[in-house]
Amino acid sequence: MTEVYANPAAGVYGRERSTSLAMRRGLMGCCPNCGEGRLFRAYLKVVDNCSVCGEELKHQRADDAPAYITILIVGHFVIAGVLAEDELYPTLNMALVGIVWSLAAVAASLALLPRIKGALIGFQWAARMHGFGGPEKEFV
């Protein structure tokens, strides 16, 4: 294998990593390197190493970004839904509407949060951020 610069500015050697593939794998909750191993050991707890390829995943620093992105996405749908419902059915009880849309927002947030965190971890891995620039594995 010939060495190429994956990131000339950072002086990182290795193969190019596909950002879209890594983000898709993370979105599905799989290792961004091999796509086989699990990314999470619990709801939002990331495994230290992939059980299949051994890629170290403890370097991830998703922090609060997945929550902000989730709020951005869910908020747009909930606000649009509330406004559309108010336009179409103006006589509905607003307390009931508030309860229903609040529950929908919580459910959508809980469903999206680990997927968005996985996609963000995949992006960090592909961009070799936060210590993900180590030696290449045989996968990918």
Walk through the language-model features, giving the residues of each.
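Short, flexible, mixed-charge glycine/proline-rich loop motifs
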Residues: 18-28, 39-45
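Cys/His-rich microdomains that often coordinate metals
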Residues: 35-38, 57
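Juxtamembrane "helix exit" motif at the C-terminal ends of alpha-helical transmembrane segments
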Residues: 75-97
